[in-house]
């Protein structure tokens, strides 16, 4: 064999392959560990029981500062019998020294600890050092001792994770609705129930049915006046009291306005919508017109005015938040566009989905629905667990709350969480945040369409399912939208026939740039159409509105049970499906008769288009969408981050004040006391004057002058004629005619009325009293 060459073993030799495999495996496992020691991530490769020290070295000067520090750290670690595991995170000059492998015995470890401590304590390059100990940390989670909380799947669904409102993470960050008051406008709230009593707000409550401050529900024959109490429990039921359940905003205050347990008028509704509107922030209204599939109704003139006034003046000018349920007429083919409360631009219209995310049998659909949240569904699915009244057959807790009546309070509670982190959200800010953060939920019945601005909407689910985490994180960084801009078209006279399907009537209106210049309206929020249509069967009409982008809204759905022969008289339909789209362009209203009966043809008499929106441009909307998505990690959801809030307006609580019975009783008592004191004072004055007159009577022919009644003298009224002195009282004075001297005869003519002066002269004449000179008088006296 030539010198200098060695025999290399072949890979297929008997032991060659196993050796190579072992080497490769060793490299695979050991290299990452060795490399990991040079990074902060290498700390995870150390045994839990290994020794380690955090060491802060004195900083060095020079261009190669970092390299010098690493060399110094290696030297110090070696001197201490340790290994430099690398810099700790991004902290300059901070390094982790760890125990070398192979010193796992207790005695060896203790000896190494003492050696390391001695070296590090005396080394001149070490500024600070600390042996690392295992720290005990626990994930922050919410635990309640309320017995029914595990059954509140809508708050924390353990059976089907993700099918809930995603609120526990918000609670963990101490966002519970603190500082916010929600009022339930309903049939009363039993505020003495232990789940509600600690959070009850008497200042925000009132009973409009009995006209007193206490909204306590009254027992009824049907045992049905528990509705408001159940809704209140959903919002603010107190946690950790070992009773029933927990509210979604359990740190908020809850008030009640009792108005549905008796006759209801337009004026009562108006009072309810604005009652204590500087105390109450959110009005939860789980009621509306009959859900019978044939009613077209809503707030009347005063109710509409109160809603508008509430969003303008309520909550110190930021606007009251009105949350309304979309309705439970689904089994009657009803539609919430025929409900004026759900149709209003001033309300947050909330629908329902069941535990599986499907539209329940009772739920209504409409183009004005903003969002949905959870409620009960079919009998096989769970309903909402909440507080109940304990009157009559109630136990204080129920597992059977359902309907959109149960969905609206959940939305109100989530809005309370939003207002805690951002109290200055306006009523339109709340609507915008819902639109921007609601999540699309799969349902085969949902007709999801994405509009020009990128928002997806369905007539069944609105913009989607409310998510408390997304709502609160968005609210935390939200800056207010621009002012509300609007455009109203002229009243468009048509008088055109409505043909039967498949034909249709189509009318157009073009909104130009010039039309929008004055208001500055650029992008849409709500679009409203007011129509007057005659038709022998109202339920056979179908109305669709197309925005300039082509987005279709079914604003008037056919209803099989609506046989009203009067059609529509200035009824306003609205849609939110064009939210964020450009306002300028051609709007198309398409109407057709889908009935199968040979009836008289309907007539579109007139219609009017109203646009609501803001000066935001499409680019502004895109930027806001991006900003909100960046906040969904929760990085801003802490107390150290707060955007400044503008001060609210100082608005009086109410223009008028309803006098309560207790106040009236107090006023009556005060009035009676005032009358008594007045009479007493008058008697006292009268008696004192008589006593004075008897004490200071005519002495030596002289009497006090002038008389006590100065008012009579000043205004020139006649004084009653009365003798000033008798002949017996005069001392050294001619008294021949003294008994006929009267006050009226002694007064100057200018102090008497004409009749009194004549009377004075006549009485002198009748008595034939000759004039005589008065005696010498002291000042202020006559005789």
Curated annotation (Swiss-Prot):
Cofactor: Ca(2+)
Transmembrane segments: 667-687
UniProt feature, compositional bias: Basic and acidic residues: 215-225, 765-783
Regulation: Inhibited by zinc and copper.
Naturally occurring in which organism (per UniProt): Rattus norvegicus (Rat)
Propeptide intervals in chain numbering: 37-140
SUPFAM superfamilies referenced in this protein's UniProt entry, alphabetically: Galactose-binding domain-like, Protease propeptides/inhibitors, Subtilisin-like
Record topology, Extracellular segments: 141-666
GO biological process, one term: protein processing
Ranges per topology, Cytoplasmic: 688-783
UniProt lineage: Eukaryota, Metazoa, Chordata, Craniata, Vertebrata
Single GO cellular component term: Golgi membrane
GO molecular function: peptidase activity; serine-type endopeptidase activity
Name of the featured protein: Proprotein convertase subtilisin/kexin type 7
Entry keyword set: Cleavage on pair of basic residues, Glycoprotein, Golgi apparatus, Hydrolase, Membrane, Protease, Serine protease, Signal, Transmembrane, Transmembrane helix, Zymogen
């Amino acid at each position: 064999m030539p010198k200098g060459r060695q025999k290399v073993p072949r890979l297929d030799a008997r032991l060659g392959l196993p050796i190579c495999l072992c080497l490769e495996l060793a490299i695979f496992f050991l290299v990452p560990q060795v490399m990991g020691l040079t990074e902060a991530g290498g700390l995870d490769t150390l045994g839990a029981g290994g020794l380690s020290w955090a060491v802060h070295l004195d900083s060095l000067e020079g261009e190669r500062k970092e390299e010098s520090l690493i060399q110094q750290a290696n030297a110090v670690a070696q001197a201490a019998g340790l290994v430099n595991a690398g810099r700790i995170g991004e902290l300059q000059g901070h390094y982790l020294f760890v125990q070398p492998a192979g010193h796992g015995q207790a005695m060896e470890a203790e000896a190494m600890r003492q050696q390391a401590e001695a070296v590090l304590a005396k080394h001149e390059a070490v500024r600070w050092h600390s042996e690392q100990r295992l720290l005990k940390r626990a994930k922050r989670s919410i635990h309640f001792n309320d017995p029914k909380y595990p059954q509140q799947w809508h708050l924390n669904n353990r059976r089907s994770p993700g099918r809930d409102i995603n609120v526990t993470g918000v609670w963990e960050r101490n966002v519970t609705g603190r500082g916010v008051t929600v009022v339930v406008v309903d049939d009363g709230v039993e505020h003495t129930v232990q789940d509600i009593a600690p959070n009850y707000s008497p200042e925000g409550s009132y009973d409009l049915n009995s006209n007193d401050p206490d909204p306590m529900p009254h027992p009824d024959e049907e045992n049905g006046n528990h509705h408001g109490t159940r809704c209140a429990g959903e919002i603010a039921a107190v946690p950790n009291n070992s009773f029933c359940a927990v509210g979604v905003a359990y740190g908020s205050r809850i008030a009640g306005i009792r108005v549905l347990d008796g006759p209801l008028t337009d004026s009562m509704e108006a009072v309810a919508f604005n009652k204590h509107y500087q105390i109450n922030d959110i009005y939860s209204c789980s009621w509306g017109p009959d859900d019978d599939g044939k009613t077209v109704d809503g707030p009347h003139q005063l109710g509409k005015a109160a809603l508008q006034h509430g969003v303008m003046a309520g909550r110190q000018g930021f606007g009251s938040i009105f949350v309304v349920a979309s309705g439970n007429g689904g089994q009657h083919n009803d539609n919430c566009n025929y409900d004026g409360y759900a149709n209003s631009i001033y309300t947050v219209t909330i629908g329902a989905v069941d535990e599986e995310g499907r539209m329940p049998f009772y739920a209504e659909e409409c183009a004005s629905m903003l969002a949905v949240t959870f409620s009960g569904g079919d009998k096989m699915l769970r309903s909402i667990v909440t507080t109940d009244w304990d009157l009559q057959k109630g136990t204080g807790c129920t597992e059977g709350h359902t309907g959109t009546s149960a969905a609206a309070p959940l939305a109100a509670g989530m809005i309370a969480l939003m207002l805690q982190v951002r109290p200055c959200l306006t009523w339109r800010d709340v609507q915008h945040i819902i639109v921007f953060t609601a999540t699309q939920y799969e349902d085969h019945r949902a007709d999801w369409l994405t509009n020009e601005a990128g928002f997806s909407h369905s007539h069944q689910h609105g913009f989607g399912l409310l998510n408390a985490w997304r709502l609160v994180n968005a609210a935390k960084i939200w800056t207010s939208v621009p002012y509300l801009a609007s455009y109203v078209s002229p009243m468009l006279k048509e008088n055109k026939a409505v043909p039967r399907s498949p034909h249709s009537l189509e009318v157009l209106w073009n909104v130009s740039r010039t039309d929008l210049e004055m208001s500055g309206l650029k992008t849409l929020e709500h679009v409203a159409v007011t129509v007057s249509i005659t038709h022998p069967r109202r339920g056979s009409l179908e109305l669709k509105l197309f925005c300039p982008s082509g987005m279709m809204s079914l604003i008037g759905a056919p209803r099989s049970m609506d046989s009203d022969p009067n059609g529509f008289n200035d009824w306003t339909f609205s849609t939110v499906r064009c939210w964020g789209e450009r306002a300028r362009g051609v709007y198309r209203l398409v109407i057709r008769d889908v009935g199968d009966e040979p009836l008289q043809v309907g007539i579109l008499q007139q219609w009017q288009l109203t646009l609501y929106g803001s000066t935001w441009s499409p680019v502004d909307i895109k930027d806001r969408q991006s900003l909100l998505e960046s906040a969904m990690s929760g990085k801003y959801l802490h107390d150290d981050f707060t955007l400044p809030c503008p001060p609210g307006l100082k608005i009086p609580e109410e223009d008028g004040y309803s006098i309560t019975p207790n106040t009236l009783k107090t006023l009556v008592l005060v009035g009676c006391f005032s009358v008594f004191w007045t009479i007493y004072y008058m008697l006292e004055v009268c008696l004192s004057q008589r006593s004075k007159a008897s004490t200071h009577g005519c002495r030596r022919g002289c009497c006090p002058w002038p008389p006590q009644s100065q008012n009579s003298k000043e205004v020139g009224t006649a004084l009653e004629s009365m003798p000033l002195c008798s002949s017996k009282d005069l001392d050294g004075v001619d008294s021949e005619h003294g008994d006929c001297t009267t006050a009226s005869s002694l007064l100057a003519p200018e102090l008497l009325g004409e009749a009194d002066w004549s009377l004075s002269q006549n009485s002198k004449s009748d008595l034939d009293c000759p004039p005589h000179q008065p005696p010498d008088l002291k000042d202020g006296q006559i005789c």
